[in-house]
Amino acid sequence: RVVTSPLMSDEELQKAIETDSLWENLVQLADNLNDYSVFHQVINRNSKTNTMEILFVASKLSDVNSYSAIAKKAGLNPVIVDVKCFTLKNAHDNTKFKSINQNTNSAILEISDDENYLMIIHNNTPVITDVFLRQPEKDLISQISDGPINDESEAVIRRYSMQVKQAIGDYEAKHENKINNIQVVSSLKNINSIIPSFKKNLPTTGFSLFDPLEGVAIPSYNAEKTNIDNRSTLAAVIGLAYRKLDVFGYYKF
């Protein structure tokens, strides 16, 4: 999430982080801060309001260990763990879109039973806005099928679209950079039935399923494996693959 804090220099920020006082004051975590792996990045400093915006990402260490254990039980050796929104950014940055002139005028929207957020990449920095849904609303979205949808589901999509529209409007007003296209990432089986409702509510914005393999030459022996309707489900894995791995151990992390 993006949090707002009093304006600080890099040195002041680092001291506040080292004493744990910064995150305790800005972010309410369910557990002890030591139970998380924390990443942060300053997005914007505003001297007029004496504030700054910080991208805050916290991954629970127990979850990381659990996922690593699952991979090991499958006979795999985990070599890298990353936050999903960052892997999606990597995949987006490295995709050669045929229908988009510049990657800078598009955004990523994740729609799922778990996470729902809009990510706009500004100057190589992800600007993330959460979309707030109650569980019954998530259930209604997952039940949408082809054809007319019921009034309850339509109302949920309308509220969802309003949050997306507000996030885009805030970004465009602040940075004077128009967002024309949204790349949708989703593991929902009915996502192709959901997208038309978003297009209806946001008619001036293009919506399409994110295809991280667009522009990629796929060998014939892998063509069948990747010939699926919704390639956005591959985005996180491909984003990880784009990471520059330190295979020779030159750098110590």
Model-derived features with residue positions:
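Phosphate- and other anionic-substrate recognition elements at nucleic-acid/protein interfaces
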Residues: L7, E11, V164, K200-P203
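Small-residue (GG/TT-enriched) beta-loop-alpha framework at ligand/catalytic clefts
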Residues: N46-V156, Y160-V164
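Glycine-rich phosphate-binding/hydrolytic loop that grips phosphoryl groups
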Residues: A91, S208-F253
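Active-site neighborhood for divalent-cation/phosphate handling
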Residues: R1-T95, F207, D211-I218
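Glycine-rich phosphate-binding loops at beta-strand->alpha-helix junctions
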Residues: K178-F207, L213-E214
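Phosphate/pyrophosphate-binding loops at sites that engage ATP/ADP/AMP, CoA/4′-phosphopantetheine
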Residues: L29, K165-N181
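Switch/connector loops and helix/strand junctions flanking conserved nucleotide-binding motifs
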Residues: R1-V2, I191-I194, G249
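Feature representing long, continuous alpha-helical segments
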Residues: R158, M162, Q166, N192, ...
